[in-house]
């Protein structure tokens, strides 16, 4: 299994509340700055953030942009449905995540989310 496949599989399980694979692939000293919440997050924080946001998001297709022994960059598409929160229509975004490894474990990552003005599922098959 490639690093990208492992990363995607781990978080797809995590979106369903099973963080066992996430726990295995992340370094104990993992830290990340979460732009959505404005906090430096550790892995436990990321799990809470993911569980909370998953209630209003549908995660779609993932694509590997770059992968090496120490670095991974993946893109995914999301549908955000904030109707229950603020009454707005669903919207779509592309997320690019850069992942850094230390001794085979994820030590840091950053995600950039960019709004889209179209539904990417009309053009890209979901995986």
Regions found by a protein language model. Name each.
Residues 1-28:
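Short acidic-aromatic low-complexity motifs
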Residues 2, 41, 56-58:
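Short glycine/proline-enriched coil/turn segments at helix->beta-strand junctions
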Residues 9, 47-127:
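A beta-strand edge to alpha-helix "cap/lid" segment located at domain peripheries
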Residues 14, 37-48, 110-112:
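Short N-terminal helix-initiation segments at or just after the protein's N-terminus
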Residues 14-22, 45-56:
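N-terminal short leaders/motifs
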Residues 19, 42, 95-99:
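Low-complexity, intrinsically disordered short segments enriched for Gly/Pro and polybasic residues
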Residues 23-24, 33-34, 108-110:
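Short, hydrophobic secondary-structure boundary micro-motifs
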Residues 29-41, 52-53:
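A short gly/proline-enriched turn/hairpin at secondary-structure junctions
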């Amino acid at each position: 299994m490639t690093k990208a496949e492992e990363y995607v599989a781990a978080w797809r399980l995590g979106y369903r509340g099973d963080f066992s694979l996430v726990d295995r692939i992340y370094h104990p000293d993992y830290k990340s700055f979460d732009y959505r919440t404005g906090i430096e997050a550790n892995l436990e924080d990321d799990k809470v953030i993911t569980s909370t946001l998953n209630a209003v998001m549908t995660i779609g297709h993932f694509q590997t942009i770059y992968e090496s022994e120490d670095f991974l960059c993946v893109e995914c598409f999301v549908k955000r449905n904030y109707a229950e929160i603020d009454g707005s229509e669903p919207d779509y975004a592309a997320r690019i995540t850069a992942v850094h490894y230390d001794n085979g474990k994820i030590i840091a990552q950053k995600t950039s989310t960019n709004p889209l003005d179209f539904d990417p599922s009309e053009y890209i098959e979901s995986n």
